[in-house]
Amino acid sequence: MTIETQEEPPEIKVYLPRVGITNLKSVAKIEWKGRIYTFIPTFEVAIDLPEEKKGIHMSRLVESITETMSEAVEEEVKKVHTSLEDLALCIIRRIEKKHSHKRAEVWIKSTLILERQTPASGKTSYEPYDVEVGVIKNSDGSIKKVLKVKVIGNTACPHAMANNQGKTHIQRAIAELEIETHFNEDIALEDMIEVVESSFSSPTYTLLKTPDENAVVRRMYENPKFVEDVAREIVYKARNRFKGKIHVKVISHESIHKHDVIAEVWA
């Protein structure tokens, strides 16, 4: 007979709002716009723990992940997940069958690879974007989601350009866009990436032939921006396209300084 020490009372009775597992890696397949995308996501799953119980049953959280994606579970195979948040919600629904709780969270981090065309030669380039999706079930049963994207671009300094006969310094910039919204709100990670990427002086590319490199440099010089300009443009576009709480953070890795610069905004 198994002794369930998790069900015993703790020495110190304190309610814990988040207890679970983190840094669990697995594999997931998502169908989007008629294509199957394979991800190697990292999961963080947490539930709340009442003050009268010593611990949670960690293995049940792991089972909820593996069973959701396992071909051994027939009802899951019949439904191909259409998004990372759909996958996260299915994990929460499975936790509901395995472990008592009032509140639950599933966070999924991964890399989304999108096909792009280089600006001059038109060659195909595959670009990586860090994404994160969180689905949260509150104690009242309501469901919300958090979508995050991180995009790499670049900026050309307008101040140096204005004071140096058109010459300026260029740096890599990294922008993050986060949206917290109702679960049923339809927001695609690809659309969030497009909002961010179009707000830099220029996008960056994995593949650049000489004509492409020249095109990127010209675009940067034709479109100089402070990090502040990038943050403002992202939040402006995001407010016009998406519903929810918006957070934008842009960091510019300065090429002429030993420090970086940052701009951040909430809306």
Curated annotation (Swiss-Prot):
Gene3D superfamilies: Urate Oxidase (3.10.270.10). Its EC number is 3.5.4.39. GO terms for biological process: tetrahydromethanopterin biosynthetic process. The keyword Metal-binding applies. GO terms for molecular function: GTP cyclohydrolase I activity; GTP cyclohydrolase IV activity; iron ion binding. Binds 1 Fe(2+) ion per subunit. Coiled coil: none annotated. Signal peptide: none annotated. It is an enzyme of class 3 (hydrolase). InterPro entries: GTP_cyclohydrolase_FolE2/MptA, GTP_cyclohydrolase_MptA. The record marks 157 as: May be catalytically important. Its cofactor is Fe(2+). Converts GTP to 7,8-dihydro-D-neopterin 2',3'-cyclic phosphate, the first intermediate in the biosynthesis of coenzyme methanopterin. This is GTP cyclohydrolase MptA. The lineage of its organism: Archaea, Methanobacteriati, Methanobacteriota, Thermococci, Thermococcales. The gene is mptA.
